[in-house]
Structures are given as C-alpha cells and as structure tokens.
C-alpha cells in the first residue's frame, strides 16, 4: 500500500469551522514545534477565511502570521486554501493580482496550494495554477463535492482530468458539507486512482458523523460493497442510534 500523506488542517479549517477563525497566533505558537515533528505531509495554516479574520477581528497582520508559523515549522511544508479567482476574498480578482498574491504567499512560506472553485469551473482556477507552477509551488486541484442530478461520478472525473491537464500535482476531493458517504468515497477513490492517477486527498467534514468511516474506506482495498440505503435513511438511523434517551 502506498504511504499515506496526511495534511493537518487544525490551525486553518479546524478552527475556522469550529471557532469562526478566531484563533490568535499566540494560541498556535506553543504547539507548532511539536506539530512540526509529527511527520505530516503538510500543515494547512493559511488561506480561506484566515486572511480576512486576521484584519477584521484579530488585529493581526496575516503575512506576519504566515511568517511566524513557518519559522516554527521548518521541517513541514505549509499549505493554504485558495478560492481560485477569489483568492482569500469575496469577489473575483484580476489575473495580475492572482499572480502577485500566489507568488507572495510562496515567498512567505506556503508551498502547497489547495485551489478550489465552488462551481468546479476550471476557468476560475487557471490563473492560480499558472502562478503556482511558475513559482515552484505544489498545485493541489480541489474538487467541490456535492449531490445533485448533475454532480455525478463522471462529472467529477471530468473535472479531475481538467485539473490534471492544468498541471495539478495532486487532487483533493473536498467534502465541505459532510455529504460524501462511505460508499461513494470508495467508488470515487478507486475511480480517481484508476483514471486520473494523481496523489489523492479526501478533505472531510464531520457534519453528518460519517468522516471516520470515510477515512477507513479511502484507505481500504476491499472489494466494492452493494449500494447502501440513501444518505437520508442513513442519517435517520444514525440520529436514532445516537439519540440520548431519558432515564426511567
């Protein structure tokens, strides 16, 4: 089995999802040297909402934060999340701004750039990808997972191929809503390994309580299972099993 490559997301998406990105740099610094010795493939430490929150709520310089984190993690590559053409903001930015921002992030300590577009529109990823490749960064193309009549396995594979053609070094299936079931995880991992052939990350959220099982499935080489009940029925069973009943 290939060696697992784990990206720790505690100080970026972990605290963004749980604490609205309010963790200050002083809260991170004491643990960073220990995290640096764990052996993570990368530590996601920047991007997403951290840039905005540093200035809007924490009175911190986001660039200084990045440099401080890198100083404490010399042995582990740092990663950031980019919203494609939106970078770390809430609107589309010009090609020049994308180019300069990505290269500035690389100079200040970022090596792995996980880039996604909420609509899986490859046009919103192109400028990021070109800048990352120019400055020698690792381009991880992210696929936004959701469920709808048009979001099929074939559509995700098609987008994954577009990311590969754009020069992606690895692929991330980004399940930001916690909707990816263990069964679908197994199918997607095997399909991506067979047809895309790039290193693959699964980014899970624990909204529906399925993340631990998904982690088992993506590391497994067991034969495929039959189609399980729908996610709605699975959620009902999970809620029923975990409901706290009053004592009698």
Task: Show where each model-derived region lies.
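N-terminal amphipathic alpha-helix/helix-capping segment at the start of soluble metabolic enzymes
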Residues: 1-19, 66, 71
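Hydrophobic faces of well-ordered beta-strands that scaffold small-molecule active sites
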Residues: 6-11, 41-45, 76-83, 111-115, ...
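Short catalytic helix/loop segments, enriched in acidic residues and glycine
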Residues: 24-35
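Alpha-helical segments flanking ligand/cofactor-binding loops in enzyme cores
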Residues: 33, 103, 130, 161, ...
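Terminal or standalone catalytic/regulatory effector modules within metabolic enzymes
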Residues: 34-54, 238, 247
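Active-site beta->alpha loop and helix N-cap motifs at the rims of alpha/beta catalytic domains
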Residues: 47-164, 168-170, 178-182
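Catalytic alpha/beta core domains of metabolic enzymes, predominantly
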Residues: 176-248
């Amino acid at each position: 089995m290939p060696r697992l490559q784990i990206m720790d997301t505690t100080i970026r998406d972990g605290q963004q999802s749980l604490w609205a990105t309010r963790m200050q740099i002083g809260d991170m610094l004491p643990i960073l040297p220990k995290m640096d010795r764990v052996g993570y493939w990368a530590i996601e430490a920047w991007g997403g909402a951290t840039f905005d929150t540093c200035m809007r709520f924490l009175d911190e310089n986001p660039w200084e934060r990045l440099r401080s984190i890198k100083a404490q993690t010399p042995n582990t590559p740092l990663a950031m999340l980019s919203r494609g053409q939106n970078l770390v903001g809430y609107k589309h930015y010009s090609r020049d701004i994308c180019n300069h921002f990505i290269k500035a992030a690389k100079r200040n300590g970022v090596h792995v750039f996980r880039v996604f577009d909420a609509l899986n529109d490859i046009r919103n990823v192109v400028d990021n990808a070109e800048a990352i490749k120019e400055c020698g960064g690792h381009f991880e193309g992210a696929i936004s997972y959701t469920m709808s009549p048009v979001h099929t396995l074939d559509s995700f594979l098609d987008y994954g191929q577009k990311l590969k053609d754009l020069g992606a070094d690895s692929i991330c299936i980004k399940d930001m809503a916690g909707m990816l079931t263990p069964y679908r995880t197994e199918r997607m991992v095997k399909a991506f390994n067979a047809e895309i052939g790039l290193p693959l990350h699964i980014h899970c959220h624990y909204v529906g309580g399925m993340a631990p099982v998904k982690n088992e499935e993506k590391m497994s080489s067991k034969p495929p299972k039959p189609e399980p009940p729908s996610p709605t029925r699975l959620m009902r069973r999970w809620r029923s099993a975990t409901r706290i009943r009053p004592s009698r």
